Amino acid sequence: STVFRQWKAKETHCRFLHGYGISFKVYFEGELDEKNWVWDFGGMKRAKTLIDGKQPKAWMDYMFDHTVIIAEDDPGMGGWETMNKLGVIQLRVIEATGAEKFSEYVYNKLNDFVHEETEGRVRVTKVKFMEHGKNAAYYSE
């Protein structure tokens, strides 16, 4: 689960911190390998390519497991940084927050990772972000 706020949504309750159990669904396309697979899902653990210096699963956990994700232009940034320094929260800062932006963020990170790991044989076609089973957003190029 992760917590975030959309500070620009000033007329809605989404401007406040709120959190969900979240999940992502990633769609791949590419040529089959010698095992007749487009992507070896178990291979994520053996990947040589890293995302921001971390194995893919470790990166996903780092970003989205018991974290507070804040937009880089959030006017309350000083307070978030103080809470992070005090060990009250695990702060993650990205360009913008929300289902749509999380889909885009993960798409870009994973597509770069997959492209490098497979030497261009596979690409991510879209990423679906889900909040608590009711809300979802897709990102694709």
Predicted regions: what they are:
Residues 1-141:
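Charge-rich, low-complexity N-terminal segments
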